[in-house]
């Protein structure tokens, strides 16, 4: 069932048909980690951002989270536009992670073609500033395109998409706040 996001008049909440997708949330199984993401589990089609400074463990935490999901039967992937698959595989080996799919890709359309083909339940994109498109866009237009494309495709494919953002060493956010305000 498609989730309706258009405006409507008032209706009693008890009269609204709840899409079955809301009953397909899934958790990592680690209480503290699940609490970081709201405690209710990941809703297929949702998107989220994770922003932190360099060297704070974003990649480590998210790869370990994907491994937990793999162990529970979910199909996951970590896509880096910055690190080679050898670097990602080395990180996975160091962490004892064996089941997570890894790729080095930067073109957003290619990434989501692969997401669709592989039927991933969750994909992490590392990182927003390194993503590109087949369109000839730059700056704010590129950010708007990426933001809309990611959130639309996540919902269409019912795949949870996590996007890594960066803070500078001084603690300021790198980039606009467009994407953090667009995700679920």
Feature locations, PLM:
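Loop/turn-to-beta-strand initiation segments
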Residues: 75, 119-122, 156-163
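Catalytic P-loop NTPase motifs of RecA-like helicase/translocase cores
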Residues: 131-132, 170
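Flexible beta-alpha connector loops of hexameric P-loop NTPases
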Residues: 100-105, 132-144
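The Walker A/P-loop phosphate-binding site
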Residues: 2-98, 111-117
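Phosphate-binding/switch region of NTP-binding enzymes
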Residues: 144, 148-184
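Short acidic loop-to-helix transition motifs that present clustered carboxylates
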Residues: 84-85, 105-111, 168-172
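Walker B catalytic acidic pair
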Residues: 126-128, 166
